[in-house]
Amino acid sequence: MARRGFLLGSLWSALLGACSRPGAPRGVPTKVPGERRQTYQYGRAAAQVAELRLPAAAPRGVVVLVHGGYWQAGYDRTLQDAVAADLVGGGWAVWNLDYRAVGDGGGWPTTFTDVAAGADHLAVAAREHDLALDRVVAIGHSAGGTLALWLAARPALPAGAPGAAPVVRMSAVATAAGVNDLAAGSRDGLGGGAVGSVVGGSPADFAERYALVDPSRLLPLGVPLLVVTGADDSTVPVSQSRDFAAAAREAGDDVRLEVVPGEGHFDQLDPRSGSWRAVRSWLDALP
């Protein structure tokens, strides 16, 4: 029992060390004059919540933001408040999504079904605020990149699979410093074994689960795709972005890859960063 406790403690320490929570970017506004904000509960759990942020004028479209944190409890949508404000200031409506993570009722399949239900609940907000849902773009950071890609892949999931038959479909998707290949992430032990913790085990043990949620196994996505990462990312290796972009392009997807010199894993959360400017440039150029 003592050895088991030591191993669990070591794993938890590794997870915390691999995804230590960044501070909010200094000197960056998180609110926009004239914006409207409303919080929606899409389930009974405290983490089953999303915040709608609307610009003062008619929005250009809706961005679904999915935060990271290696799918571990203790991280939430406030990680993306600064980039959410930047989007609203640029005329986009934002659906900033929370979900249950490992240690907070999440894991397999709850983390995935939460993200699916949360994205679909956007339809409720759209009816209340007369929002068009023909231009909905998912943007995810780190572990949220995995989930954003998976949201785009949902229309192709088999009946009965977690997240199948989406109510709201993504028209484009961006993954920023994302864990885009879960099987490779499991093999490489990313986040101290975080991939196995959210899927329930390794690809060898749960091949059928990985087939349903691993973005690298769900290509092509069939929508415009941005893959962006910092060249100095030491949390999620750059190969996760380069290799996924190459595989998506080979599968026939419209892919843009941006590897930003001198930036690391958390720069994407700062709207002043080159990584975020790459996201905005791609987003604002979408048809």
PLM regions with names:
Residues 23-57:
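N-terminal cap/lid segment of alpha/beta-hydrolase-fold proteins
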Residues 242-287:
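C-terminal catalytic histidine-bearing segment of alpha/beta-hydrolase fold enzymes
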Residues 75-83, 96-133:
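Catalytic nucleophile-loop/oxyanion-hole region of alpha/beta-hydrolase
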Residues 227-229, 233:
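Short beta-strand/loop motif that positions the catalytic acidic residue
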